[in-house]
């Protein structure tokens, strides 16, 4: 992979990632992965897994606003991690919440949404199918409110 061709590097990494997922599926090994949910690219995979008898669970780690997400990225960069442009953080923050509430939470077998803004994550809601059990009403209202801005 070449530092002079970062887009080619991202594409190669993506191919490796998808091949690893497919390897686990074929072997019927449990697996997990992290995503921002900013896109809808995993919908087909989730539908396929559920059709094939897999149980699909989503653990969504939420932040109260895009500003905190920017601070988390800045902290990561200060420790040698990769940077993300501010415009991408803002766009992904909103798209992620929209996708969580509009598509993913009801598609998977079970969703747990955690607020990760303090010392200990707090459960905001759990959901199975269309049945949502709200644990933190003010937080879920805040998160749903961001979708409409």
Say what each PLM segment does.
Residues 33-43, 63:
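Acidic, metal-coordinating catalytic cores used for nucleic-acid/nucleotide bond scission
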Residues 1-29:
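Conserved substrate/cofactor phosphate-moiety recognition/catalytic segment
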Residues 54-103:
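A glycine- and Lys/Arg-enriched "phosphate-lid" helix/loop adjacent to the NTP-binding pocket
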Residues 102-149:
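NTP-dependent small-molecule kinase module
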Residues 25, 50, 105:
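Anion (oxyanion) recognition and catalysis
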Residues 44-48:
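A short acidic, amphipathic alpha-helical/loop segment
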């Amino acid at each position: 992979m070449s530092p002079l061709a970062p887009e080619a590097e991202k594409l190669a990494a993506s191919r490796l990632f998808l091949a690893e997922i497919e390897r686990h599926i074929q072997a019927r090994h449990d697996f997990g992965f992290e995503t921002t949910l900013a896109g809808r690219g995993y919908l087909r995979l989730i539908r396929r897994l559920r059709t094939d008898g897999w149980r699909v669970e989503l653990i969504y780690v939420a932040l109260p606003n895009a500003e905190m997400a920017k601070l988390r990225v800045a902290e990561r960069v200060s420790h040698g991690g990769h940077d993300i442009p501010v415009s991408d953080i803002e766009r992904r923050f909103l798209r992620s919440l929209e996708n969580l509430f509009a598509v993913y939470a009801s598609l998977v077998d079970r969703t747990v949404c955690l607020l990760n803004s303090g010392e200990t994550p707090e459960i905001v809601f759990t959901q199975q199918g269309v049945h949502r059990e709200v644990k933190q009403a003010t937080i879920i209202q805040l998160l749903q409110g961001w979708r409409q801005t």
